[in-house]
Regions:
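C-terminal capping alpha-helices of c-type cytochrome domains
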Residues: 85-136
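The canonical Cys-X-X-Cys-His
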Residues: 32, 36-45, 121, 125
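Positively charged n-region of N-terminal signal peptides that target proteins for export
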Residues: 1-6
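Residues at helix-coil transition
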Residues: 15, 44, 62, 96, ...
């Protein structure tokens, strides 16, 4: 009986995961650009973006955490990358409380507490390919 309940619970989580990821991408990219201004002290995105205190974020959606060439990630972020991909749901969780999700992350920012702000900034970041160009252009 326990295994059946566990299997049912796991199945429900797996079915909900794409929906969670989609919800995180329903944000407003224009509003996300404004939210991202508070991230710009450490991060850059767009054409010509370069690493700063934190890594540049072009093409972050779909990237394995801790793998951007040219940036020195914490051992904790590199370990987190084993088995994770930056998708909307993972970014949403991380941006809410970075140090709770990746204990030992170099990111000092405490997190974006508001769901809508996280959805907006994720929608904004999702617009950029690896070269900082708007996707689809």
């Amino acid at each position: 009986m326990r295994n059946e309940v566990r299997g049912l619970a796991l199945g429900m989580v797996l079915l909900a995961s794409p929906a969670l990821a989609q919800d995180a991408l329903t944000g407003d990219p224009a509003a996300g650009e404004k939210v991202f201004r508070q991230c710009m002290a450490c991060h850059a995105v767009g054409e010509g973006a370069a690493n700063k205190v934190g890594p540049e974020l072009n093409g972050i959606i779909g990237r394995t955490p801790g793998t951007l060439e040219g940036y020195t990630f914490s051992p904790a972020m590199i370990a987190f990358g084993d088995g994770h991909v930056w998708d909307a749901a993972t970014l949403d969780e991380y941006l809410a409380a970075p140090r709770n999700v990746v204990k030992g992350t170099k990111m000092a920012y405490p997190g974006l507490r508001k769901d809508d702000m996280r959805a907006d900034v994720i929608a904004y970041l999702a617009q950029f390919d690896d070269n900082g160009m708007a996707k689809g252009n």
